[in-house]
Amino acid sequence: MKKSVVRRVLKYIKPYKGLLALAILSAIISVSLTLYIPVLTGNAIDNIIDKGNVNFENVLQIIIYIAVGVAGVAIFQWTMTYFTNVISYKTVRDLRRDVFCKFNDVPLSYIDTHSHGDLISRVINDVDAVGDGLSQMFLQLFSGIVTILGTMVFMFIIDWRIALAVIILTPLSLFVAAFIGKMTHNRFARQQQLQGDISSYVEEYVGNQRIVKAFSYEDRAFENFEKYNQELYTVGFKAQFAGALANPSTRFVNAMVYAAVGIFGAITAIAGTLSVGQLSCFLTYANQYTKPFNEVTGVLTQLQTAIAAAGRVFDVLDAENEPEDKPDSIKVENCKGNVKIENVNFSYVKDKPLITNFSLDVKSGSHIAIVGPTGCGKTTFINLLMRFYDTDSGKISVDGVDIKDMERDELRKLYGMVLQDSWLFCGTIMENLKYGNPNATDEEVIEAAKAAYAHSFIRRMPDGYDTMISESGGNLSQGQKQLLCIARAMLSNPTMLILDEATSSIDTLTEIRVQKAFAKIMQGRTSFVVAHRLSTIKESDVILVMRDGNIIEQGTHDELLAKGGFYKNLYESQFAK
């Protein structure tokens, strides 16, 4: 799992191999200069203590070389950091873009069955964690590899016996780090999962503050939050504690190696095999050799978090896409709006059918109303019309063309939709109204707003049509939001209309005005209206009464009342005095 995740992250880095080469080159130059400085230092020491004479001319020249080397190290360390950060940020940008685009490709069922807060956390928090891990990995990896190889060469030049001992003993720290890393991986994965859960809960809590306060749910909400928060603390603490053991453990091993090198080197220096300057140089190299091992284990916690986060991101990218449109998809030209449904069966969960053997023939320009108790399949019927979900069996056609033979985008452009939830995005009122028709003129927008009885309240807004709408339309009433959604649907000038509980949150006077506007826009257009308020659908050409996924009654308002069946009971339950 970990290896496959790392390989996939590396594929995102591949397009930036040019920058990678520059980063590696910077690392090589920086480390080479760093490794040469101890040689200069050793020479300076030997020039000071050799035979009791100080060669000031040589020492001064060496100091100048050291100063130039230090400046070079600083410059090339900066360039290495710059290039690695660019690679990291570009990789994060690409990864986040792919995850966001993936939401356009997955079926609606995926979005419906996953917490929105958790999905948001994967796009924001998890991708950021991957970026942080990449930055640390690059910085430690590039300089670390070059440092290890370079110090090995220099140590073998000075004394191959001590060098061999250092090379054999130091990797013991890697075994310690690997053991701790394996032990903590699952804990870091659980930590990322809990962060997604808590993000989801906070989003739900903040987005529904009116309900929370209306039911005095604050204390219970806090108790629920505290459970998530405490579990995240516990899991996070255990993960961080276990991860934190890696660095001191490896430092202890490497410190013991360094001490052994110092003792053995001192003995060889006394024996005359090494000069004092060479011993000083060797000790510096031994320290630099062990340093990358210490640094890697120091960022092990962050790398583990990054791997766990990348796994969650790739879980989204690996989700099954909507079936692709057929390459020979048919485009319905000059759509008239004839819709035919033949023996449709559908279920959200296998073995739990919701719509069974559903058939309906809708002629162009007909106004179809769908009513029934909650959960009877009304909204599901709309989902099937728009191909948000595909039927299990049966066929839905528009003007004789099976909708599965059409491109989804082309099918959905035929419909104008007003949903039960009035969705508006952060932007001006004008931008929101043009959402379905970006090429509409301002005059066309205003005409649509007037037809939807939204123009009057828009004019009273601080900046009129340029008024900014806050997140989810928080600075508008529910009725105002629905009026804007209705105007948006009108502006798209669709062939067919879908109205899902469109007027359920509008006051009676506004509802009457909206019904008049809808009567105008529905002229000549096939329209499907889903509503619980039966007063809004009296003028429909056909009313379908659904229960348990089946049409149990069908006819006009008067015909259904005359039958004295289920529809009459629904109607009388709403208007009983």
Please name every model-derived segment.
Residues K2, L20-F76, I157-R161, G272-V276:
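Transmembrane helix-loop-helix hairpins at lipid-water interfaces of multipass membrane proteins
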Residues S4-V5, I13, I45, M80, ...:
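Juxtamembrane loop-to-helix connectors within ABC transporter transmembrane domains
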Residues P15, L108-S109, N125-L134, F138, ...:
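An intracellular "coupling" helix at the cytosolic face of ABC transporter transmembrane type-1 domains
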Residues L25, F76, M80, S88, ...:
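Hydrophobic alpha-helical transmembrane segments of ABC transporter permease domains
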Residues G52-N58, F154-I168, K238-G311, V316-L317:
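Helix-loop-helix
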Residues Y89, R97-S121, N125-V127, S200-N224, ...:
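Short intracellular "coupling" helices and adjacent cytoplasmic loop segments at the cytosolic face
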Residues D325, V332-K577:
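ABC-type nucleotide-binding domain
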